[in-house]
Amino acid sequence: MRSVYFVAARRTPIGKLRGALSHVRPDDLAAAVVRDLVATAGIEPGQVDEVYWGAANQAGEDNRNVARMAVLLAGLPESVPGATVNRLCASGMEAVTVAARTIASGEAEIVVAGGSESMSRAPFVLPRPDDGLPNAMSIADTRLGWRLVNARMRELHGLLSMGETAEEVAQRYKVGRERQDEFALRSHQNAAAARDAGHFAGEIVEIDGVTSDEGIRADTSLEKLAKLKTVFKADGTVTAGNSSPLNDGAAGLVLMSEDALKRSNLEPLGRYVAGASAGVHPDVMGIGPVPATQKVLDRVGWKIGDLQQAELNEAFAAQALAVVDQLGIDPAIVNPSGGAIAIGHPLGCSGARILTTLLHRMRRTGDTRGLATMCVGVGQGSAVLVER
């Protein structure tokens, strides 16, 4: 198998629900990043062999195959193909993994991969009725969670909401409210410090004058977080403050074979080492990064102690802390630039976003081994290892 390198990694600012990016279609968010990536990498648009793009929704303006839409809207030649990848929250990460495997197998030299999501613009949907004249019809909000579910799924696994799965993880792995709030505070503090130090500047593509993430709250405190009511369970621990919000954004990376890299004379951001995914019970989907990370580490012979930097997507503080505990990873290396609780979690974008942040930080710090990992709705986890 051939070596695969990252030569560019960029993202939009992450917008709040109904915030500064809510007027921008998801295909336009994707196109803006694809266009910028080609320019940043200094490659000719026609050199791109494939675009793989993640999207978790696919019910609205992402228009079935947002990857192909992004190719054409970005002005790439019509000869450049595009395929959309959906592993829910890990869609952007899965797109990168598919791209890396395509290059490693010798089927491509240069691939653009990433993901986008506009949760602000996610549509409501109506199922097509079996009866031509139904007495009533249900409408589904496609922003997050279950929709138009097979009744057999309820019988087999139940249908806990994302927040309810976080409560389940908190209970099973004994992650208390105070610890969750402390983790959320750290996320905001670290993200604010990284933003103010200019650490995100090299990542961000300006969109209509927006240049920074909207959700970072530098002024939050444990006192403020402690006052928030639990959302999913009366005697629970999960609140809006220790959970990731709903967001809009896009992120992507350019991957190259070693031969293409040598011809380009570009300095790589890092090397793709390996990726893996794993399944868990849907009720504890938040613990998914544990088996996924263990699988990918075993695949390459690394140990958890070999890692110097880690990006763990913070769907909920409860699950992130449970993952840290179960992996035995040093908490100090996890999300030192903040995470999704502060920055945001636009579903299909997030896997590519955390890889982008990880690679830029490793270049800045000089660290050589990194992990990006995340939980996935309906009981999965995904992980990618990189090195410099």
Which positions does each model-derived feature cover?
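Condensing-enzyme catalytic core mediating Claisen C-C bond formation in acyl metabolism
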Residues: 1-24, 36, 144, 149, ...
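N-terminal extracellular/periplasmic Venus flytrap/periplasmic-binding protein-like
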Residues: 11-12, 22-27, 31, 40, ...
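Conserved catalytic cysteine-centered active-site region
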Residues: 24, 55-111, 142-146, 156-161, ...
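Short, well-ordered amphipathic alpha-helical segments that serve as non-catalytic structural scaffolds
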Residues: 27-42, 66-70, 95-98, 162-169, ...
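Active-site-proximal alpha-helical scaffold in enzymes
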Residues: 87-117, 170-199, 253-259, 346-367, ...
